[in-house]
């Protein structure tokens, strides 16, 4: 019996010692690789199409230096850390296709981002950016750019050169107007400018002939511009929570809007929480077909 208790006691102590050791030896994956003499490249994940490396939610305040030697990396995820600076050495990662910097504390991006000539997707949302370097416009392959939840009020005019950009998120910033360079992005299919300080939508919006999703909710927009009705490719138009009082008779031209939408994810026209007087809110609630009919009749009377 005593021997059993002794063995049981020994078993109880074993895991506790292991747990204690685990806490003391809790190395990050890259530290573990370096301490064991392994090549950091062994941490790379090789998928069918991309070589990726992830350091998500590590509590990092600095990026480990060895990373800049991993020239093979094509997808790099550094999101949800506490990074305050992206060093210029990022320019060494010339094969990067996807770079995720979401959820850090970055106040700026280095000019060396211009060296990332393969970059197609860049997430810098949920940071502290007050400006974006003009050099980013040299990343001519860029297709997706998220700058939401920052402190931006303008974009460099040369962003008009991002001719392949298809999705742009500028929501939750301090824009008083949509930057003019945006209206030169002919391939844009998604534009989110919600929760800014917009009071109007420029007539130039009509130049975005490929736009399918336009979100401008949560601003202080006073009028629904007729030029927006010329963007006939729109499938989702969200103008919720603004100061719009009337709808243009040309609204029926947006024939790809299939319904009055209430769920934020649904395609259609989102126009709730506006002080509509003409047409009456009750008419809007009757559905898009009734609304279009009313606006057409109004136009011919």
Curated annotation (Swiss-Prot):
Transmembrane segments: none annotated. PROSITE patterns: LRR (PS51450). Disulfide bonds: none annotated. It comes from the Eukaryota. LRR repeats lie at residues 72-93, 95-116, 118-139, 141-163, 164-185, 187-208, 210-231, 233-254, 265-287. GO terms for biological process: intracellular signal transduction. The keyword Nucleus does not apply. This is Leucine-rich repeat-containing protein 30. It comes from Homo sapiens.
């Amino acid at each position: 019996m005593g021997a059993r208790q002794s063995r049981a006691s020994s078993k109880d102590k074993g895991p506790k010692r292991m747990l204690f050791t685990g806490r003391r030896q809790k190395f990050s994956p890259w530290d573990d690789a370096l301490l064991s003499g392994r090549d950091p490249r062994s941490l790379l994940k090789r998928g069918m199409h991309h070589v990726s490396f992830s350091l998500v939610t590590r509590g990092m305040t600095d990026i480990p230096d060895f990373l800049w030697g991993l020239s093979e990396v094509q997808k790099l995820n550094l999101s949800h850390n506490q990074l305050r600076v992206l060093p210029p050495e990022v320019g060494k990662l010339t094969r990067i296709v996807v770079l995720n910097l979401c959820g850090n504390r970055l106040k700026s991006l280095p000019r060396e981002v211009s060296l990332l000539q393969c970059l197609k997707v860049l997430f810098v949302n949920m940071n502290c950016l007050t400006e974006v370097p003009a050099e980013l416009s040299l990343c001519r392959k860029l297709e997706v750019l998220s700058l939401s939840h920052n402190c931006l009020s303008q974009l460099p005019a040369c962003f008009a050169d991002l001719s392949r950009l298809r999705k742009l998120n500028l929501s939750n910033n301090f824009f008083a107007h949509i930057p003019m360079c945006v209206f030169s992005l002919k391939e844009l299919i998604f534009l989110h400018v919600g929760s800014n300080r917009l009071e109007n939508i420029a007539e130039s919006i009509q130049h975005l002939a490929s736009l399918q999703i336009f979100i401008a909710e949560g601003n202080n927009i006073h009028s629904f511009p007729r030029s927006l009705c010329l963007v006939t490719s729109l499938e989702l138009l969200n103008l919720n929570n603004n100061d719009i009082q009337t709808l243009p008779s040309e609204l029926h031209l947006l024939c790809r809007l299939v319904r009055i939408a209430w769920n934020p994810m649904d395609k259609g026209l989102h126009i709730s929480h506006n002080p509509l007087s003409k047409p009456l809110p009750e008419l809007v609630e009757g559905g898009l077909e009734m609304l279009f009919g009313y606006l057409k009749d109004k136009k011919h009377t």
